[in-house]
Regions:
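Bacterial Sec signal peptide processing site at the extreme N-terminus
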Residues: 1-7
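A short, hydrophobic beta-strand-centered structural micro-motif
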Residues: 9-16, 93-125
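Hydrophobic structural segments
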Residues: 21, 39-43, 151
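Amphipathic beta-strand/beta-sheet edge segments enriched in Tyr/Trp
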Residues: 119-156, 164
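Acidic/histidine-rich, surface-exposed loop or edge segments in extracytoplasmic proteins
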Residues: 9-32, 85
Length: 177
């Protein structure tokens, strides 16, 4: 991720709304429960962003929810905007009404860009490790154009370590894994 280009700016981080474990992981007590895995993944994403890219002011999902509640009738709940559709790599412009919902929410926190964790897929590898594929998109809220997208991939013995590895791959810090 080109965080130097975002240096000194606020970037809204939308909550993850699509996390899917494969069948081999469906019995996992964390990954199989949507109400648990989504806030857990959000916290790891925000932890990685603030720790690995402190030059950007990241406005996390909790702050976005609070801003949306304060602007009832104006802003949409960030957990129910349907932004998982941004996982489609062929999407060149964010369609309405999602585009206007992102623009409104981002404006409420005085930002221009939104980082959208579009989806997280957890897979069991043949060696027993967990592999995660996290699709991330940065959207320019003014134009509705995805400015950057990536699939962060990580593999480790636990889902948390795999997600951290994926985030480390997309947010590299020299000399640190």
């Amino acid at each position: 991720m080109a965080t130097p280009a975002l240096s000194g700016q606020k970037v809204a981080v939308l909550p993850l709304t699509l996390a899917v474990p494969d069948l081999a992981l469906s019995s996992d007590t964390l990954l199989s429960v949507r109400a648990k895995v989504l806030p857990w993944a959000d916290s790891l994403v925000l932890e990685a962003l603030t720790g690995r890219a402190p030059e950007v002011t990241w406005v996390g999902p909790r702050e976005l929810r609070r801003a949306a509640r304060r602007a009832t009738g104006l802003a949409t709940d960030p957990d129910h905007m349907g932004h998982a559709l941004l996982r489609d790599p062929l999407l060149k412009v964010v369609p309405d009404p999602l585009r206007s919902q992102i623009r409104t929410l981002v404006a409420l926190v005085d930002a221009r860009y939104a980082l959208v964790p579009a989806s997280a897929v957890f897979l069991k590898e043949a060696n027993g490790n967990v592999k995660v594929e996290l699709k991330l998109v940065i959207v320019d809220a003014r134009t509705g154009v995805p400015a950057w997208r990536s699939i962060a991939v990580g593999s480790a013995t636990t889902p948390a370590m795999a997600l951290r590895a994926a985030l480390a791959a997309v947010l590299p810090v020299a000399g640190v894994q």
